[in-house]
From Swiss-Prot:
Chain positions covered by the region annotation Disordered: 93-113, 273-338
Post-translational modification: Phosphorylated. Phosphorylated by RPS6KA1 at Ser-334 upon phorbol 12-myristate 13-acetate (PMA) treatment; this phosphorylation results in dissociation of the CCR4-NOT deadenylase complex and induces p38 MAPK-mediated stabilization of the low-density lipoprotein receptor LDLR mRNA. Phosphorylated by protein kinase AKT1 at Ser-92 and Ser-203 in response to insulin; these phosphorylations stabilize ZFP36L1, increase the association with 14-3-3 proteins and mediate ARE-containing mRNA stabilization. AKT1-mediated phosphorylation at Ser-92 does not impair ARE-containing RNA-binding. Ubiquitinated. Ubiquitination leads to proteasomal degradation, a process inhibited by phosphorylations at Ser-90, Ser-92 and Ser-203.
Species for this entry: Homo sapiens (Human)
Reported effect, residue 92 to A: Inhibits MAPKAPK2-mediated ARE-containing mRNA stabilization. Inhibits interaction with 14-3-3 proteins and AKT1-mediated ARE-containing mRNA stabilization
UniProt superkingdom: Eukaryota
Residue numbers bearing the Phosphoserine modification: 54, 90, 92, 203, 318, 334
Name of this chain's protein: mRNA decay activator protein ZFP36L1
Gene Ontology MF annotations: 14-3-3 protein binding; DNA binding; mRNA 3'-UTR AU-rich region binding; mRNA binding; RNA binding; zinc ion binding
Length: 338
């Protein structure tokens, strides 16, 4: 058994070392011959070169260890990560190593403060640009963007231009070269100043609608919102076309009926018109609109006020205050004390 293992190892080593040369004639025992025949599967019948892709090409040391372990019945040593990578034919170390370092081509636009702030000269002259959508200049007025300038941009004269008559910055200079630039800058400032400001009449629910904004503007522009409306009489209101017709409305009253209804309570003569009382200023109204009494004279004033109110409702006398009369409850208390 030992002789068989040693002979198999020797023949395997000689096969690895003599690979690429012509087939050699080995004098070996039957077991070695069987191993050689099993290894040379696919080799031509006559003596010739063996097929190069029929045998793997590992290192000789690893192949010896694997062969000895397989003959002794031991498990084969595990392949390291490096050996497994190189044994894999589909692995490309250079490509895999360079793959993470490659940058993906960015499809976004270049972030520049002057992007699309000037018109593309070839596009304006020829109607076409070789850069297409990737061009950094504006292809038309609709793509032109406004450039954010410094507050002092074009506010002072360019010393270089007005000294030697030439400026290396040209139209991109931040100072004024001629009167046209000054006028253009002034026009741009006027446009920004004339921009309408936001209204401050925003509700909590959000921005007002167009109809509400138009109504508010109409109210502000109308002169009736500044001056009070004129005082109308009852006759004007009754004769207004906006009121319903008296013949069809059962709750409509004529001026004479209104006078007869309100005359007893208002102290008006029976034949008078209620328009003189309903639509006259408050300064000429009865004392029912007087200020409340002071705390010192509250009892007497309350008594007089109540008495005047009762008398006005009864229609017996005019609505005047009577300080001599008291409430019935206070009269009873004074009698019981006596």
């Amino acid at each position: 058994m030992t002789t068989t293992l040693v002979s198999a190892t020797i023949f395997d080593l000689s096969e690895v070392l003599c690979k690429g040369n012509k087939m050699l004639n080995y004098s070996a025992p039957s077991a070695g011959g069987c191993l050689l025949d099993r290894k040379a599967v696919g080799t031509p019948a006559g003596g010739g070169f063996p097929r190069r892709h029929s045998v793997t090409l590992p290192s000789s040391k690893f192949h010896q260890n694997q062969l000895l372990s397989s003959l002794k019945g031991e498990p084969a040593p595990a392949l390291s990560s490096r050996d497994s990578r190189f044994r894999d034919r589909s692995f490309s170390e250079g490509g895999e190593r360079l793959l993470p370092t490659q940058k993906q081509p960015g499809g976004g636009q270049v972030n520049s403060s002057r992007y699309k702030t000037e018109l593309c000269r070839p596009f304006e002259e020829n109607g076409a640009c070789k850069y297409g959508d990737k061009c950094q200049f504006a292809h038309g007025i609709h793509e032109l963007r406004s450039l954010t300038r410094h507050p002092k941009y074009k506010t002072e004269l360019c010393r270089t231009f007005h000294t030697i008559g030439f400026c290396p910055y040209g139209p991109r200079c931040h100072f004024i070269h001629n009167a046209e630039e000054r006028r253009a800058l002034a026009g741009a400032r006027d446009l920004s100043a004339d921009r309408p400001r936001l209204q401050h009449s925003f509700s909590f629910a959000g921005f007002p609608s167009a109809a509400a904004t138009a109504a508010a503007t109409g109210l502000l522009d109308s002169p009736t919102s500044i001056t009070p409306p004129p005082i109308l009489s009852a006759d004007d209101l009754l004769g207004s076309p906006t009121l319903p017709d008296g013949t069809n409305n059962p709750f409509a009253f004529s001026s004479q009926e209104l006078a007869s209804l309100f005359a007893p309570s208002m102290g008006l003569p029976g034949g008078g018109s209620p328009t003189t009382f309903l639509f006259r200023p408050m300064s000429e109204s009865p004392h029912m609109f007087d200020s409340p009494p002071s705390p010192q004279d509250s009892l007497s004033d309350q008594e007089g006020y109540l008495s005047s109110s009762s008398s006005s409702h009864s229609g017996s006398d005019s609505p005047t205050l009577d300080n001599s009369r008291r409430l019935p409850i206070f009269s009873r208390l004074s009698i019981s004390d006596d």
